[in-house]
């Protein structure tokens, strides 16, 4: 906040055009040695910024691209990086800076591919047939695990100029991360839970843009950021209303914040957390915190699903069904049901299970169960933060 002449302070509004450059105060692994994943707990110092947030909000992160990938692209283009180009905001800059900070340089757009096949006879022969609408699925399968750098290396006859190349790129967008802390306990910092994306495909190491950017921010390093407020994904106004939280993996982030908020307020309204990951020994994020919350009553019930700790895989939706009668009872008591995490599979599985619980334990028909779940959502008692 800025100081006014009368001693009061005014709130500073941060957004994409006016971000706050926050520094990392802590970057530590949540996953233990032996885990197949790299998930980080990252704390960001916002002291002196006037930045305010509430539980359920997200933090917008303006990432930069991987410098090694930028150098590989420059090499493939035969450029030194000092060439003059126009960035995504229509401002003059160097090619290297544009690739590092302004443009998305991983996933090729259809526009990029359409121009590529016009410039390269080899690409026209190999990729051209996939660019018709009838081949949409085949194109998606072909592009899986491939990035722009692959097309630059494989089709050098395209002979891109720096200006022509960047003209086909999309703007590098902000990434949103669910905030994993409560301002009531941490007013000067924001916590994130970040799953670092790294994998090999087609002979190259691929890296998630924002997750790798954050994971490689050592303590003291800063980046552009601002808070993206939530509209509905927040705690009930009445602290006595029960809450059911389904947050496997990094989806647990906002629920850590919810529970911290209730801890700070001394609230003992019922709360139930479903958490899942691969292995309890290596991948139980915030285990000590949640165990302590169980002891002091902030967390009423904790149901876990570790998919690889037994021969058959168990996920959070399986635990929901096992506890279906009690879960239904909580819903009848007015509980708010939250889900956070993967939208493509997990959230759909959880939704199907919620319908099944309404049928099996609520005695509802399929149509009545669908109406019940729809009403939960309409009444803001079924809230999602999925991505």
Where are the language model's segments positioned?
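FNR-like FAD-binding dehydrogenase module
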Residues: 1-387
């Amino acid at each position: 906040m800025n100081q006014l002449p009368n001693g009061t302070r005014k709130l500073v509004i941060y957004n994409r055009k006016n971000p706050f450059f926050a520094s990392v105060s802590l970057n530590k692994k949540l996953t233990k040695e032996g885990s197949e994943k790299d998930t980080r707990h990252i704390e960001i110092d916002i002291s002196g910024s006037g930045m305010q947030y509430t539980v359920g909000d997200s933090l917008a992160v303006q990432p930069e691209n991987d410098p090694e990938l930028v150098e590989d692209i420059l090499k493939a283009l035969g450029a030194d990086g000092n060439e003059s180009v126009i960035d995504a905001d229509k401002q003059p800059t160097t090619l290297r800076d544009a690739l590092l900070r302004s443009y998305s340089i991983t996933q090729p757009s259809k526009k990029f591919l359409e121009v590529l096949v016009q410039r390269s006879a080899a690409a026209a022969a190999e990729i051209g047939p996939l660019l018709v609408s009838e081949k949409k699925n085949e194109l998606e399968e072909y592009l899986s695990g491939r990035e722009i750098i692959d097309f630059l290396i494989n089709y050098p006859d395209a002979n891109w100029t720096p200006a022509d190349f960047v003209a086909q790129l999309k703007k590098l967008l902000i990434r949103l991360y669910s905030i994993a802390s409560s301002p009531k306990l941490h007013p000067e910092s924001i916590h994130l839970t970040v799953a670092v994306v790294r994998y090999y495909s087609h002979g190259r190491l691929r890296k998630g843009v924002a997750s790798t950017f954050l994971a490689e921010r050592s303590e003291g390093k800063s980046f552009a950021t601002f808070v993206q407020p939530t509209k509905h994904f927040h705690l009930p106004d009445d602290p006595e209303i029960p809450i059911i939280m389904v947050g496997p993996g990094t989806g647990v982030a906002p629920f850590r914040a919810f529970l911290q908020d209730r801890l700070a307020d001394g609230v003992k309204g019922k709360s139930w957390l479903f958490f899942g990951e691969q292995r309890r020994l290596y991948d139980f994020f915030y285990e000590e915190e949640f165990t302590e919350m169980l002891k002091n009553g902030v967390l009423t019930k904790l149901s876990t699903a570790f998919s690889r700790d037994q021969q058959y895989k168990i996920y959070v939706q399986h635990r929901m069904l096992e506890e279906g009668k009690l879960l239904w009872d909580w819903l009848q008591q007015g509980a708010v049901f939250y889900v956070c995490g993967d939208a493509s599979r997990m959230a759909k599985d959880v939704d199907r299970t919620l319908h099944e619980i309404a049928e099996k334990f609520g005695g509802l028909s399929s149509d009545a169960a669908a109406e019940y779940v729809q009403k939960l959502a309409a009444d803001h008692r079924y809230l999602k933060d999925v991505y």
